[in-house]
């Protein structure tokens, strides 16, 4: 199971960086609708098979975000 709420995480990181989802979409050459669909996806942004493998091995998944140095 993925412990993170990807939708909330992306929204928080957008706020922290003073960026809207529209601007984020423009930066990666896609639409806001696609960005929204990706972060709201019910089975998440993590590969479903990978999640299943980790669950069988007895692990949950937690994503950690590390700001890149500039």
Give, region by region, the residue ranges found by the protein language model:
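Residue-level signal for the short linker/turn that defines the boundary of a DNA-recognition helix
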Residues: 8, 18-19, 45-48
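Short alpha-helical DNA-recognition segment
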Residues: 18-33
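Short acidic DE-rich linear segments
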Residues: 67-70
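DNA major-groove recognition helix of helix-turn-helix/homeodomain DNA-binding modules
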Residues: 48-63
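The alpha-helix within a helix-turn-helix
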Residues: 14, 25, 54
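Residues within the helices of the helix-turn-helix
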Residues: 11, 22, 36, 51
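A short, Lys/Arg-rich alpha-helix, primarily the initiator
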Residues: 1-17
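Recognition helix of helix-turn-helix/homeodomain-like DNA-binding domains
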Residues: 29-44
